């Protein structure tokens, strides 16, 4: 394995920084997701530096963007007869080694950035198991705590 000179190392580090800068411009305000991507890029940079073929196939860019995102409304009727509408999401990140797998989160703080962060990390968690599963995550800003069975159903 050949060692890289300082200029080559700087250029490659700049490449991951360019990927992150482009991602930040595209996904402004998604702080949880961008922080997760930043941490992963920092940790994989030494391996990325040793394998120029990863850049050729744009491996990092393919990993950091979800395959698809579904956004939908969740209308429901509370015990008082009032109609409420929450937002639901399903982020499907990567199915390169198998079908998307990831849980569901229900909490008022749920937003797209949080689910992208969780789906991104789920991809790596699943890859570390011996089961062929990709990564995804779903959820809604619906708060089930304190709701009746009828409201949750």
Which residue stretches match the model-derived regions?
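N-terminal ligand-binding/catalytic initiation module
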Residues: 13-153
